């Protein structure tokens, strides 16, 4: 919110997960009063579903959104149909079978846990405390 985007950008690109959720994304759009598009951050159908919900909650949406990136994944835990270039705002329910099939290996799970520990010990705990965030 601290950046003055006037005369710096023409269109605000909103990505739900990196911005902290739908409510925060909506608040940013309202604050900056710029035309917006919603794009994904190469997420599963669950994340894409949140992007679709954000797009559906915006008062105006004059540009095409970038929410079809799920097609870049070899597999996904749910399907979001695209009909005539459009996606419906709807609940996204992951397939239990797909989640079992796509479950990360023990080695990959350990890799991610180690990565989070390294980030935390590199100062994330201090930043969270300084920002007043709750973990």
Task: Show where each model-derived region lies.
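Flexible C-terminal active-site loop/helix
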Residues: 41-135
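Catalytic core of soluble alpha/beta enzymes
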Residues: 1-50, 55, 74-82
């Amino acid at each position: 919110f601290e950046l003055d985007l006037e005369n710096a950008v023409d269109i605000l690109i909103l990505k739900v997960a990196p911005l902290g959720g739908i409510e925060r994304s909506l608040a940013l759009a309202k604050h900056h009063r710029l035309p917006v598009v919603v794009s994904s951050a190469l997420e599963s159908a669950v994340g894409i579903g949140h992007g679709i919900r954000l797009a559906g909650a915006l008062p105006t949406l004059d540009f095409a959104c970038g929410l079809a990136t799920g097609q870049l994944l070899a597999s996904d835990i749910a399907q979001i149909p695209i009909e005539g270039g459009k996606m419906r705002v709807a609940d996204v329910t992951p397939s239990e079978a797909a989640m079992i099939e796509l479950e990360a290996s023990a080695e990959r799970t350990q890799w991610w846990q180690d990565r989070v520990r390294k980030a935390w010990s590199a100062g994330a705990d201090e930043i969270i405390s300084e920002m007043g965030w709750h973990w």
